[in-house]
Amino acid sequence: MKNAVKNYFKNIFAECSKVELVWWWLLRGLMVFGIIDTIVNGKDYDGSNPVIQMFANLLGMFAYEICQLFPKKNRMRLLSPRFQNITALGFFLGSFCGAYLNFYYIVPGFDKILHALGTAEAVYIGYEYVAATQLKFKKTCPHQIATLCSLGLGFVFSSAWEVFEFTYDQFFGGDAQHWSYANALKTAGGDPSKIFNLFLVSDPMRFALMDTMGDIVLNFVGGFIMYAILCIIPYRHKGKGDVNAKILREHAEERKSEYEAATV
């Protein structure tokens, strides 16, 4: 058991740079501070419970470490730690800035910005997942196909997030979708013209619908921007991180071993 724990941390430190570890723990530390401060001082918040949201997203900040608990050949175990540089920031912006600092209601368009960034992040994670899948099955793949797959996965992830928000609001009394016109109007000082929305809302009854449609439009925009970036810079399919080259080397080593075994 002791050796297993030792090897677990050894694998993590071997794959991650010191800069990455500092980055992760800086964001995690701020999240812990926000949770403790909210519990001790009982901050008011217009939306869902910030403690629950921050604690759940704090766990999400350990995604890479959790992935390392999977069996060695599992594709989750094969994910690069690079993905957590982005996901940790996403969780931080959504929970610490959004829930703890209440940016969702006091910063115009904050939720919309996060939706664009979130789907861009989802496409990025999808790209890493495709690369991990290649490593698992030892199959090469042109970067054009890999990036197209990542786009599809990104939209699946963003749709899953919308389902999560709906479920949380519908069955647990939350405001994850920020559908509450009353909260938005209160934050705007009672002036409907000061409520930020991507589309004009002439009827308060359409506020929630227009908010969700704005989210979907920006999901689309953010996802395609990241897709374009990955098409231009397919970093997992060129240079030192080229998974295709790694797979071809492994195939060559296997053939060499088979040849040597056959000639003995």
Which residues fall in each region the model found?
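Bulky hydrophobic segments
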Residues: K2-M213, F220-V264
